[in-house]
Amino acid sequence: MDGNVPILVRRTTMEETLDVEAKSHVEMFHHYFFTLAPDDKYIRYTMEKAMYLVDETGLAQYNTLKEKGFYSNIVGTSAVFSIFCDSITFNKEKMEFTYYGRQRIERRSNILMRELVTAGQLKRVPRTENNPHGLLIVNWRTLLNKDIEQKTKSNY
């Protein structure tokens, strides 16, 4: 401190913070891609945000789900999807990650929990307002997406 003014002790480089930035980027992408509400505009908004963080492998997955009517079904059934990150492993040398999480799907009559594991690599790109970490997920794929628990909701 210089009087009441804080002094910048040391600047950090992206290399020093890569592990934290990579995990944050991966978690942010999964939040946007897998948090869904029964609202067309919200789904378009979150998918647009997610697409800034991933290469064409994410777009291909989105288009496949869209063609199958997945997003229309969410709106039609008033389903709400939430994602919970359990952990993310990141190999700095290979720039590879594995995401481990759970997805909660709440429908009118039941709540379904799914286990989700995805993997991919990260590529450095310029930082932008839409991609603040300066990373792009490439070769993204789902390794596991299975039901782990289903509960019937009580009608009051």
Identify the residue ranges that each predicted region occupies.
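Structured, amphipathic secondary-structure segments that form assembly/contact surfaces
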Residues: D2-V20, F34, P38-Y156
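Solvent-exposed, amphipathic alpha-helical segments
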Residues: H25-L36
